[in-house]
Amino acid sequence: MAATQHLLDVDGLSWPELQRRLAVAEQMRAIRLSQAGRVNDLRDQSVAMLFYEASTRTRLSFVEAAHALGAHLIDFDVSSSSVGKGESLADTVRTLGALGATTIVLRHDRAGAPWLAAQAFGGHVLNAGDGWHAHPTQALLDLAVLIRHIAASDGSLAGRRIAILGDLQI
């Protein structure tokens, strides 16, 4: 496996790193919209969906992305697991690692849960929202939409004031 990388928050990402991630996302989007539609970049990887909170768009987007990238999907149902008997997040992610998960997509109602998961898990952790604290994948999506639609005229968001109310339409 490549060096472990997590996406826990966008606060620590530099502008060049944000641009790099957005460029990769745009490449994947173009492939997805093309005739090919799929790549197998993650064909030897297992992605575990670990959602402690209900989610429609975020969860389904990650499921579809995992399939489109060729990953094996581990769809973990928190409601029918030992979490209900008190199993800790750390124990749950260690179990997923023992079962072969290389990446965990975590949605949790507790701020900081993704950092705890990253400490306990030997693979990649993607924060799909941790309460009211952070939702870096949503932030990246919002930024990508802004760049694609608003800044397309001059290629820059510099000097613009932008307010986001509710969900962006994508």
Regions found by a protein language model. Give the residues of each.
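Positively charged, low-complexity intrinsically disordered leader regions
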Residues: 1-64
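Short, glycine- and charge-enriched coil/turn segments that flank and shape catalytic ligand pockets
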Residues: 31-39, 122, 150-156
